[in-house]
Every structure is written in C-alpha cells, then in structure tokens.
Amino acid sequence: MAFNGKFNFNRICVLDTETTDKYWNSSAPVQIAAVICDRKGNILDSFNERIKTNHAISPDASAVHGIYARDLIHCRTEKEVLSDFCIWLMNNEIDCILTYNGEAFDRPMLNMRCKTLGIQTDYFDKTKFVGIDGYYDCIKDAKTVNYKGLRDALGRKWKLTLVAEHLGINSSGAHDAMVDILMLKDIFWMVDPVIHPSRWATEDKPTSLF
C-alpha cells in the first residue's frame, strides 16, 4: 500500500538486501539485513544473514558488495533464510517497511522470490503492505528545499553513501546490507521530521517529536 504521508507507525522495519544482479526481476538475495525501530528511531531488534544462493552472482554485483559464491558455502539456503525472516517480521508485528530505493528494487525482488519459493507473505507486496522509500519519500524532498545544502552538494546524485557523507554520517563499510540500513535509519530520523513536520504530528503533540 502506498505511504499516505502520515508517519503513524510504531514498529518500523528498516530493510536492505545485497543481491546476485542489478535487476530485481532476475536477482536473488545473498544478504538480508533489517532492524526494527520504534517511532523515535530506537532499535528494538535486528536480523542479518547471508544466503547460499542457487543463482550465479554477477561480477558487477560482487564488485559492489564484495560477496562471492565461495563466501556463502556454509550459509543457509534462500528458502530457509527468507522463511525465518518473514516469521521474524511477523513476530515483531511491524507496521511498515523503510528502504532506500527499495520500493523499486528490494521489495518487488523479495516478493518475487517468496512467490517462487512458495513462502506465503504480504510484507513485500506493495499493494498490500505499506512501504516508505527513503529517497523518494524523504531525500528527494530534502533536496528540493536544499536541506543542509543537499541540492547544492549533490545535484541529481542520490546514492545513500553520498547523502550520509554530506550529512556527517559515517559511511564506512557501505554496501554491506547492515551498514546501509544503519545509515538509512540515521538519515531518515535526522531529516524527515524536519522537512515533513506535519507527518510526525500526533493528537497530543501537534509538533514534531524531535
């Protein structure tokens, strides 16, 4: 379901994957990482696991995330990890998923893989479960208003590491899925309440929680 512009969530899953290829409809995950955050961005739980995939990992993908087939020999299978990940999401009673460009890549890729593997879940179906895209629903608007000089510094560039570095957030180890979601978490909770204060308003607190 599309994000309706109100941040009325209490258990947010910040999610990222590393994959075998750059196209969502031909990729499979080689790493899934996620943290569950409360409304203020405090981490409540985490999940991080590499996956022994049956897909060939493209050289271009390995050049980005540094994961090769030899690194996954002793990892669990994709169906095992994805099944446990979906159970973990359910047990954490999440009410939305936050990604960075993940509405166009991570969620449809995971939705396709779950269907292929016979895993019943709605978490990755954009028509059934709410997702927030950290770029299109946050950073793009921040650049429009030139928050902290983002537009001047980055122009049309959008990579998570560039945004993090400009905002003074550590990007060491980028392209490991867990490192990337921690960057995204820090960026989102720094930027979104400032540029979208009405999203964060509550009945008892008419202004931002921050």
Predicted regions and their residues:
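Metal-dependent phosphoesterase core characteristic of DEDDh/y 3'-5' exonuclease domains
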Residues: F3, N10-R11, N25-I67, N91-F210
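Long, highly charged low-complexity segments
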Residues: G5-K6, T17
